[in-house]
Amino acid sequence: MTETWNFINTGSKDPYYNMAMDEALLNFVSRGEIDPVIRFYTWNPATLSIGYFQRLQKEIDIDKVKEKGFGLVRRQTGGRGVLHDKELTYSVIVPESHPNMPSTVTEAYRVISQGLLEGFKNLGFDTYFAVPKTPEERQKLKQPRSSVCFDAPSWYELVVEGRKIAGSAQTRQKGVILQHGSILQDIDIDELFDMFIYKNERLKLKMKEAFVEKAVAINDISDEHITISQMEEAFEKGFKKGLNIELKPLELTEAQLAEVEELTEKYRSDEWMFRK
């Protein structure tokens, strides 16, 4: 019998709400209030999100982010900086105890990302999992050279034509797995690299050139322009097939929505943003 999970598309929201909703959904699943959930969302304004462990003032040019009119938010997941602009963002929230969820982070990535793999197939892309094969490649995962996400595939992230096409991060809290990530529709590499601090311009240029070789957006390799709504349809079907589930619409209660609003203030606060 096929299991049924929740599905919610919260549309285009500000960065604080987006991160608050992910944390709130994790809380609701942890408390047993809702079944596992898949969420889709986009960002308004375009936002630079940084990983939980990143050093904001050492790695990010905050004035440049403000000058461009972008949002800035710290995630509760690890990883590096991501510019959320022309993309579909997804979250998967599921108990660690779920029978289909492996105990290790990398294997759970593989299971959850099967939904992404099927979504890319639905859009006509020959996509596969990146699995670092050599000790050198595995060491690079532990010591990334840049603050920018997408500049190298990590375990079981998705690659098409040798370049990373979806970047994801995972956290485990309160007995629950939260994996969220970006599915790039288009990317402006100059905009992205302008927001990070480098020792010198030569290093910045070198990193940018390496990034172009290693990362790609859907419309860079598609013969036809693919819209966000087409992506939503493809990946909703992809998660159903990849995880062997059905999806039902999730409607949150007034009390649950109030919890989201309360958490929004946490992500808006300087205390959270400048914690590292």
Swiss-Prot record:
Q: Name one Pfam family in it.
A: LplA-B_cat
Assigned EC number: 2.3.1.181
Q: Name one GO biological process term.
A: protein modification process
Q: Give start and end of each BPL/LPL catalytic domain.
A: 32-247
Please name the InterPro entries in this protein's record. Answer: aa-tRNA-synth_II/BPL/LPL, BPL_LPL_catalytic, LipM, Octanoyltrans_LipM/LipL
Reactions catalysed, semicolon-separated, are: octanoyl-[ACP] + L-lysyl-[protein] = N(6)-octanoyl-L-lysyl-[protein] + holo-[ACP] + H(+)
Q: Which residues are responsible for catalysis?
A: 149
- Which PANTHER family does this entry report, sorted A to Z? OCTANOYL-[GCVH]:PROTEIN N-OCTANOYLTRANSFERASE, OCTANOYLTRANSFERASE LIPM-RELATED
User: What further fact does the record state?
Assistant: In the reaction, the free carboxyl group of octanoic acid is attached via an amide linkage to the epsilon-amino group of a specific lysine residue of lipoyl domains of lipoate-dependent enzymes. The reaction proceeds via an octanoyl-thioester enzyme intermediate.
Task: Provide the protein name.
Answer: Octanoyltransferase LipM
Give the gene name.
Answer: lipM
